[in-house]
Amino acid sequence: MKNIADIAKIAGVSKSTVSRYLNNGSVSLKTQQKLDEIIRENDYQPNQFAQSLRARRTNMIGAIIPRMNSFAVDETIKGVKTVCDQLNYSLLLNYTNLNIQLEIDALETFYRSKVDGIVFMATEITDQHLEVINKINVPVIIVGQAHDDLHCIIHNDYQAGYLVGDMLGQQGYNDIKFFGVTESDIAVGVQRKEGLIAGLEAHNIQPEISLTSFNYQEAMVDVVEALQAYPHYDAIVGATDSIALAIHKYNSEHKPHAHEKYIVGFGGDPVTDIVSPSIHTINYNFEYAGSVAMDKLNQMIQHQVIEQRIIIDVEQSFEN
């Protein structure tokens, strides 16, 4: 009878990859399909005792969150929690403050706590993350970032950026400032920015770009410096609603005709509609993304094959 080493040799993968597959850990869809076929053809039967040890489920789900007091995080976790309640899972949260080492620690802590699965709201995926996720043999689903070797739920950030760029071009805005974030965050720092640039280029417009932080207070410092140096933009775009709120605050306090500035953010935070004049924003379906993530994670826990990547579209909530 074939053993794990035999299956690994036939598949051309490591024994640890086969072990992750058998324990419903994180392997690519292509590898899952290959192992499905090989195991079926060879009538491989995993050690029942070993499987029974892993089958002792705790009905606990771990969620790793990057920020507190964030509309995006709150809404995503709301969606996760709704599905957890429906499926009788308890939800544990671990807050990491955008710190990679704390994220690594959280993954290992949840593994030691024997959670059935992990929802990871990532701002970037490094080799360190990948190494730990592959090692812990716990189903992990990523929300907010894409990686070819992991199961991911992502928002269509390129679409979001393009909608804003195209809308500004159609409206006749030409002198445009964009406050972006580091490209280590692929979704916001790369995809969203590239979409915006493409939307503007369709109208032969090039934005002036500065980098800032996700943190409101830190963004405020960068916004003040940039807009004091050149205050004459007719439209200003923040890569997030928090950055857009910092822009709004500066304009409200420093310019007597702040309403003449067209300010745009991303996320759909209700605060953007409360301030006056309101901030135009792209709505993200964060709660829905959270519910999809938890539903798919449950399928992984049940040893079902799921899509490698699911893209959630965004919505333009304001009129041109």
From Swiss-Prot:
It comes from Staphylococcus xylosus. GO terms for molecular function: DNA-binding transcription factor activity; transcription cis-regulatory region binding. Residues 1-55 form the HTH lacI-type domain. Residues 4-23 bind DNA. InterPro entries: HTH_LacI, Lambda_DNA-bd_dom_sf, Peripla_BP_I, SBP_2_dom. Signal peptide: none annotated. This is Sucrose operon repressor. It comes from the Bacteria. The gene is scrR. Keywords: DNA-binding, Repressor, Transcription, Transcription regulation. CDD domains: HTH_LacI, PBP1_TreR-like. PANTHER family: LACI-RELATED TRANSCRIPTIONAL REPRESSOR, TRANSCRIPTION REGULATOR, MEMBER OF GALR FAMILY. Negative regulator of scrB expression. It holds the Pfam family LacI.
